[in-house]
Amino acid sequence: LMKEYSSGYYKVPSVGAGTANTEFETITGMSLHYFGPGEYPYKSILKETTCESVPYVLKNLGYSTHAVHNNEANFYGRRSVFPNLGFDTFTSEEYMADENLQNPLGWVKDSVLTDEIIKCLDSTDSPDYVYTISVQGHGDYPSEPILDNPSITVSGSPTDELNCKWEYYV
């Protein structure tokens, strides 16, 4: 793939938590090194101030800009932050038709995102930028089998508990 298509490396500021900071760097191209230790721009400056971003650049090129996230709109203040980052629309789990479609851990399944992305694309005549954030993959993953007839089974981990966690993840 690297020989045939654009490719590169992508480094994120956090793993396992702090999704909003990874989003911030991705959407703005700005490093968190310019902020205080432990600061979340979503929880501070972006609640009240706009910031140059990919959505603003694309809006200037005639795109409609949409954000979609299958979690609560107020988590990390996204309800007020996304307009300040240039998104025309923001659809959160509260507005998703299949909100009750949850995985065994209570997260809204990613399968609802496809319909929401299509709704965004169908809502305008212009080109669209749809920024979509998944929540389903959040852990802590179950340490006992909870899936009936999993499509993929996992073995080879040091413990059965880890096998179950990996099996649920994949």
Task: Please identify what each model-predicted range represents.
Residues 1-170:
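Solvent-exposed soluble domains appended to multi-pass membrane proteins
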